[in-house]
UniProtKB/Swiss-Prot annotation:
<keyword id="KW-0560">Oxidoreductase</keyword>
<comment type="function">
    <text>Catalyzes the 2-beta-hydroxylation of several biologically active gibberellins, leading to the homeostatic regulation of their endogenous level. Catabolism of gibberellins (GAs) plays a central role in plant development. Converts GA9/GA20 to GA51/GA29 and GA4/GA1 to GA34/GA8.</text>
</comment>
<feature type="binding site">
    <location>
        <position position="202"/>
    </location>
    <ligand>
        <name>Fe cation</name>
    </ligand>
</feature>
<dbReference type="GO" id="GO:0045543">
    <property type="term" value="F:gibberellin 2-beta-dioxygenase activity"/>
</dbReference>
<dbReference type="InterPro" id="IPR026992">
    <property type="entry name" value="DIOX_N"/>
</dbReference>
<keyword id="KW-0408">Iron</keyword>
<dbReference type="InterPro" id="IPR005123">
    <property type="entry name" value="Oxoglu/Fe-dep_dioxygenase_dom"/>
</dbReference>
<keyword id="KW-0223">Dioxygenase</keyword>
<dbReference type="Pfam" id="PF14226">
    <property type="entry name" value="DIOX_N"/>
</dbReference>
<comment type="pathway">
    <text>Plant hormone biosynthesis; gibberellin biosynthesis.</text>
</comment>
<feature type="domain" description="Fe2OG dioxygenase">
    <location>
        <begin position="171"/>
        <end position="276"/>
    </location>
</feature>
<feature type="active site">
    <location>
        <position position="267"/>
    </location>
</feature>
<feature type="binding site">
    <location>
        <position position="257"/>
    </location>
    <ligand>
        <name>Fe cation</name>
    </ligand>
</feature>
<protein>
    <recommendedName>
        <fullName>Gibberellin 2-beta-dioxygenase 1</fullName>
        <ecNumber>1.14.11.13</ecNumber>
    </recommendedName>
</protein>
<keyword id="KW-0479">Metal-binding</keyword>
<dbReference type="GO" id="GO:0046872">
    <property type="term" value="F:metal ion binding"/>
</dbReference>
<comment type="similarity">
    <text>Belongs to the iron/ascorbate-dependent oxidoreductase family. GA2OX subfamily.</text>
</comment>
Length: 327
């Protein structure tokens, strides 16, 4: 049973919602089995920093099994879940997102992909959950590399693995997160929606999101307006991260996104974050510069990751590394 306390206006952030939530039909769709996938990926990254993928090759029964085990974990007594925490940064956490005061209607597991055992609960069910997580993380890495290779092909740059090699590296800093947003009928307060996870961009190269069929995920368009992404439990959604924005010298833009809590149904999302090795230098790729001036100062992934720990979710974290304003 989930024991998050009732939301109060002092704890959480609300978003005014005078209109019923409508889902956008403009989300870019990429069929990974089609030859035009590489072209569509580049256009989606340029226009939205976000796209949906189908025909991804991940068995739906494996996804459903992991989702079921995740729900079992989050239904454990609070004292049991907290044995896997606190999230500092890895493990179980709830409400608090990061170290700088961000709060959300959420509980979560944050795991590193470089260790087989990185949360401390044990038991038959938990061992099954852990095994499914390991298999899923491997599948996500393979999908990420396929997408990143298609991206490089679409950009007409060599080598083809210029992005994916950073994910395949044994020292890669990839992370996996399972977010649970409990249902809470009390959320319909004065026509407002409760923030489950506040607006932010992901600092990594790309992130791969999959959720159950519960709504709540939104992305921000270039004009600053928010659109709701239709849930689809059989597909995956790709976010461009800050690191990829820098590597493409601003041609691709990291997508600002957030989650609004659902008052009726619980939402469960699983996100694979593709991070490079900590020592990797992040800078615009020479093959994409073509005589253009670099918009960003070079930094290591460790430097940028460290800076994110000292910031709030909504901060423009790339601002400290801009040479001239990215347009």
């Amino acid at each position: 049973m989930v024991l998050l306390s009732k939301p109060t206006s002092e704890q959480y952030t609300y978003v005014r919602n005078n209109m019923p939530i409508t889902f956008s039909s403009s989300i870019p769709l990429v069929d990974l089995s089609k030859p035009d996938a590489k072209t569509l990926i580049v256009k989606a990254c340029e226009d939205f920093g976000f796209f949906k993928v189908i025909n991804h090759g991940i068995p739906l029964d494996a996804i459903s099994q992991l989702e079921s085990e995740a729900f079992k974990f989050f239904s454990l007594p609070q004292t049991e879940k907290e044995k896997a925490g606190p999230a500092n940064p890895f493990g179980y956490g709830n409400k608090r997102i990061g170290l700088n005061g961000d709060i959300g209607w959420i509980e979560y597991l944050l795991l590193t992909t470089n260790q087989d055992h990185n949360f401390s609960l044990y038991g038959e069910d938990i061992d099954k959950f852990r095994g499914l997580l390991k298999d899923y993380k491997c599948a996500m890495r393979n999908m990420a590399c396929e997408i990143l290779d298609l991206m490089a092909e679409g950009l007409k740059i060599q080598p083809k693995n210029v992005f994916s090699k950073l994910v395949m590296d044994k020292q890669s800093d990839c992370l996996f997160r399972v977010n649970h947003y409990p249902a809470c009928p009390e959320l319909a307060i004065n026509g407002e929606n409760l923030i489950g996870f506040g607006e932010h961009t992901d600092p990594q190269i790309i992130s791969i999101l999959r959720s159950n069929n519960t709504s709540g995920f939104q992305i921000s368009l270039r004009d600053g307006s928010w659109i709701s992404v239709p849930p689809d439990h059989s597909s995956f959604f790709i976010n461009v991260g800050d690191s990829l924005q820098v590597m493409t010298n601003g041609r691709f833009k990291s997508v600002r996104h957030r989650v609004l809590a659902n008052g009726i149904d619980p939402r469960l999302s699983m996100i694979y974050f593709c991070g490079p090795p900590l020592s990797e230098k992040i800078a615009p790729l020479p093959s994409l510069m073509k005589g253009k001036e670099s918009l960003y100062k070079e930094f290591t992934w460790f430097e940028y990751k460290s800076s994110t720990y000292g910031s709030r979710l909504a901060d423009n974290r790339l601002g400290n590394y801009e040479r001239i304003a990215a347009t």
